[in-house]
């Protein structure tokens, strides 16, 4: 099972909006070098909403190729049409991903019954492990622990990314879903507590730019060392907040560019590059987190 420090990887782009595969390869090498436990390719932070399906699959496939078996790659396979999610899932099943991460269908606001039917249909289209993804702040639907529990019996649904920031759900999910069901935090600000309460890992935005420290925090929390985890986590807390001064992944792409991790901080419309009033805030947070800016 995949656990620990997982990066929700950005998708680097050139100034013309095309994917910058050279920078993508460098990012994969960077995370392998820094000890990151796994990569999520083309999730929310990877701009899945603005990559058409063929490009989406290509980026995931190239990430798998660059990883070359040295780090697991989880491919984003969410869509708000079940038929589209199934088509994407079938394509990703051919490129070597270790698992897939499927966000709840967004905008059309399915009922709990609809969520269960959606995820069962997607899971039935592949043998690859599936991770559910609950982020109501983006999707306008909240998949409650009771709904997640209805999917535990599906053999290749292995866990959930819970991004509400409500750490009380860790206990409830564990009670309903059992000890073998993987629980991943999707909220950096509450990730430490999530792990200390029994979570298995974190799918993180901040991990793009502080992977070594974030890995150390996760390892300490998973080992039950609350004091060490807190000492690592506290200097990063300003960063967790400031990386959401505008919609993710606008700030983290800007930060990665300032660090020299990617050649360009370009982001696809309708998102636009980081506004100037956020520059100083983010630079201050990066300084406090001991990030070197080029």
UniProtKB/Swiss-Prot annotation:
Q: Which PROSITE patterns match?
A: DHDPS_1, DHDPS_2
The protein's name is 4-hydroxy-tetrahydrodipicolinate synthase
Entry similarity comment: Belongs to the DapA family.
Q: List the subcellular locations.
A: Cytoplasm
In the UniProt record, does the keyword Cytoplasm occur? Answer: yes
Q: What is its EC number?
A: 4.3.3.7
> A GO BP term, please?
lysine biosynthetic process via diaminopimelate
Q: Does the keyword Coiled coil apply?
A: no
Role of this protein: Catalyzes the condensation of (S)-aspartate-beta-semialdehyde [(S)-ASA] and pyruvate to 4-hydroxy-tetrahydrodipicolinate (HTPA).
**Could you state one GO cellular component term attached to this entry?**
cytosol
Task: Name the pathway it acts in.
Answer: Amino-acid biosynthesis; L-lysine biosynthesis via DAP pathway; (S)-tetrahydrodipicolinate from L-aspartate: step 3/4
Q: Which organism is it from?
A: Shewanella sp. (strain MR-4)
State which residue ranges cross the membrane.
none
Specify which residues bind pyruvate according to the UniProt entry for this protein: 45, 203
Q: Which residues carry out catalysis? A: 133 (proton donor/acceptor), 161 (schiff-base intermediate with substrate)
Record's catalysed reaction(s): L-aspartate 4-semialdehyde + pyruvate = (2S,4S)-4-hydroxy-2,3,4,5-tetrahydrodipicolinate + H2O + H(+)
Q: What molecular function does GO assign, one term?
A: 4-hydroxy-tetrahydrodipicolinate synthase activity
- Site annotation (Part of a proton relay during catalysis): which residues? 44, 107
Q: Which UniProt keywords apply?
A: Amino-acid biosynthesis, Cytoplasm, Diaminopimelate biosynthesis, Lyase, Lysine biosynthesis, Schiff base
Subunit structure and binding partners = Homotetramer; dimer of dimers.
**Which gene is annotated as encoding this protein in its UniProt record?**
dapA
């Amino acid at each position: 099972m995949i656990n620990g420090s997982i990066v929700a990887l950005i998708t680097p782009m050139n100034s013309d909006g095309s994917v910058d595969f050279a920078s993508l390869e460098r990012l994969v090498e960077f995370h392998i070098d820094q000890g990151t436990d796994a990569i999520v390719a083309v999730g929310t932070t990877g701009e899945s909403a603005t990559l058409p399906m063929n490009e989406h699959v290509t980026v995931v496939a190239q990430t798998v190729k660059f990883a070359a078996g040295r780090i697991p790659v989880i491919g984003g396979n969410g869509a708000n049409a079940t038929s589209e999610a199934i088509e994407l899932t079938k394509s990703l099943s051919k490129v070597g991903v270790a698992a897939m991460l499927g966000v709840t269908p967004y905008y059309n606001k399915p009922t709990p019954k609809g969520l269960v039917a959606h995820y069962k249909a997607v899971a039935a289209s592949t043998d690859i492990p599936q991770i559910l993804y609950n982020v109501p702040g983006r999707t306008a639907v909240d998949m409650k622990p009771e709904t997640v529990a209805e999917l535990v019996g599906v053999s290749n649904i292995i866990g959930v990314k819970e991004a509400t920031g409500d750490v009380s759900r860790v206990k409830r999910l564990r009670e309903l879903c059992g000890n073998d069901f993987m629980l991943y935090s999707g909220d950096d600000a509450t990730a430490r507590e999530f792990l200390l309460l029994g979570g298995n890992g974190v799918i993180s935005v901040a991990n793009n730019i502080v992977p070594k420290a974030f890995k150390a925090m996760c390892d300490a929390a998973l080992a039950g060392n609350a004091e060490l985890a807190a000492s690592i986590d506290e200097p990063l807390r300003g960063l967790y907040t400031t990386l959401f001064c505008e919609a993710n992944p606008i700030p983290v792409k800007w930060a990665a560019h300032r660090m020299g991790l990617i050649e360009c901080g370009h982001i696809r419309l309708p998102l636009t590059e980081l506004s100037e009033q956020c520059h100083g805030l983010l630079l201050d947070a990066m300084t406090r987190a001991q990030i070197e800016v080029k």
